């Protein structure tokens, strides 16, 4: 009977409690809380209903095993069950799915053919199956005999994207359930192993969702360890997998020494000491970010040697050479192709402006010249006539490029001017973008008027008080007094005073850079829309400028004040663009997530249920952050070249991390409450009452936040029946502790870090991380070209201050205000460079995974009930998308529907590839 029970599945792969108190009607019996949740049933699941088999799983038994049983029954009736069990051997079959590259270079093709040849003579891919049980004789996991993948040589020329290889293992009846598999690649070339499925065990197919590069044994001699899709908490790890679990984590941690190879899979920490390049020029030296002077999150360690001129700076790797990230974090082929196409587009877009800038004036003359970037193509825009081509040989090359790739040299029309060419000029549109644009996370309710600075007057002087008075705004309050407007929650503000003022002297000393520290006061009208009623422009009190340190600009009353107002709004837009890019986008959704990702790979086994939950939300983030260090935030990179703050941009980012960033305030509800945009209200659907009811970012964001939170709670409660399980989960606690104490070491002593002691604590922490990686990043990223591609709407930098009557430039401003306006804006080359970059950053790649989607959705976990719950989560995301579409057609929602008004789709979950101004990917992948 022992043998029969083993065969018929009484001991399943999933070695947990046999309690049947599950709300999911699962085929498996797994200990959990007996609580029904929103996602327990999925009405939209297209898969056929499963039959519930309460008596156990019907085994898939191989023919060899059946024959052996028949012989054993007839010929060995007198033997003991133990001896019978030892004598039974049977075969199981492995199917390995390998993903091919679509394009190979000559070297890769040559090595592939060499591997095909050597595979015939024994240099194979070797697999070894590991049991969940320990062999009592060796005190090590039970193992199968080694097996090789068959027909590698025959299939080497296959053009299919996925190629399936098979292998056969011989195991005996005492083997137990498979829990891991080792892979040894004796070829010269790495390969991408997508999955392995084992068939022939009593429990049915066993899945290994690998999605990993397997390196050649010559580069990495140790065997690759891959686990089944069955999740285990550390305390529940089967005895046969415990050593393997810890060994794999040790492999991923490394020893913190040496320079990393591109084929490595090691996750470790370092400071941002590779932004500058002091070996080339002293002007390219930059301070290290991370430490007491410039606090910052940690990034992935590469181990490169120090520069010659600064032992504390790491030697840079410049394009086209790749930066190190662990091999499985690198972009897959389709993502690489999308990036390469965008780089080509950027090069072509900037080639002609670079040529023109050397021979013609660098400023735009009028709005028509900007418009022609989208309508006529760059050559027509630049006015290269036949006689000019004759004089300059280089433009002949450009002509060829123009004829052969005309589409690449013409910019797409940004959405902000696609419906209404002049919408960006209107005050209501300027204000609307504070709640429905690309940076809707800085607006806050005014609680006292005039606003008060939090800067230290002993450091920044006594002139920190605001120049705003009641007289500046009283005529714009629909008959209310200022106090009444405050009490009825009608006054709001976008305040960049404190974040910019400490840096203005250095910024304004840069060539071609001029900035104020701005405050914009907004009034909530009876229609639920906002209007700007005053803009305060501040300079340091000891500024070298001849201008007053503070001035207030109010809505225009004549032609002169109209141009003053437009220039003031442009300076606000420049402040906003800098904070958006350097703080809200890069710092809060890119850099601050990297430590959590590094710690997850170092401390959470691939078998850990929380790792499986987080996995899709970590995809590509380390790679895109490495690319950012190489080209975007580097010395003289895109950010320094295109934004007002120039080389001081990352210092502003560091100051924001030091003074403003708090993980406990990064979740949407907490952030809305902190900014005074909402108050707790248990009667509302999300427990919050928005003080601006038509706040598209918050309205749609709360839908996604709630769905993510419910999904996370469903998942967490599945594995943690009580708080003690969380407190004693060694891997989970190590992950959170390392994220704080190492990854965010400069904030390690902060009292605001949430505890990780209860189920609710874990739900909150994981929900916040997933929110930041998905919806928050999408809201801040994918509208960059649709809103910022028309540079006058939100110029990334300004080159001139606003003149007043005492300024010598005031006369030229009065004589030709349009010329002064464009001379204040970015130059032609700065504009086209910025447009090319934000076009790339706003692009969805074809392999994007969106919220509610997963690779291998039915086998990413071996917990069938969680698979069902995930399908329920996906269905909820689909309902949210329909609700967002409905809201965008509702004329009562004036901040997202109306003549010339862009619909708010940045949190609409799905998208086609390209620049769409919608779509919520699972992770920070661009």
UniProtKB/Swiss-Prot annotation:
Residues 1-58 form a transit peptide. Its EC number is 1.13.11.12. Residues 106-228 form the PLAT domain. GO terms for molecular function: linoleate 13S-lipoxygenase activity; metal ion binding. GO terms for biological process: anther dehiscence; anther development; fatty acid biosynthetic process; lipid oxidation; oxylipin biosynthetic process; pollen development; response to bacterium; response to ozone. Gene3D superfamilies: 3.10.450.60, Lipoxygenase-1, Domain 2, Lipoxygenase-1, Domain 3, Lipoxygenase-1, Domain 5, PLAT/LH2 domain. It comes from the Eukaryota. Belongs to the lipoxygenase family. Plant lipoxygenases may be involved in a number of diverse aspects of plant physiology including growth and development, pest resistance, and senescence or responses to wounding. Catalyzes the hydroperoxidation of lipids containing a cis,cis-1,4-pentadiene structure. 13S-lipoxygenase that can use linolenic acid as substrates. This is Lipoxygenase 4, chloroplastic. The gene is LOX4.
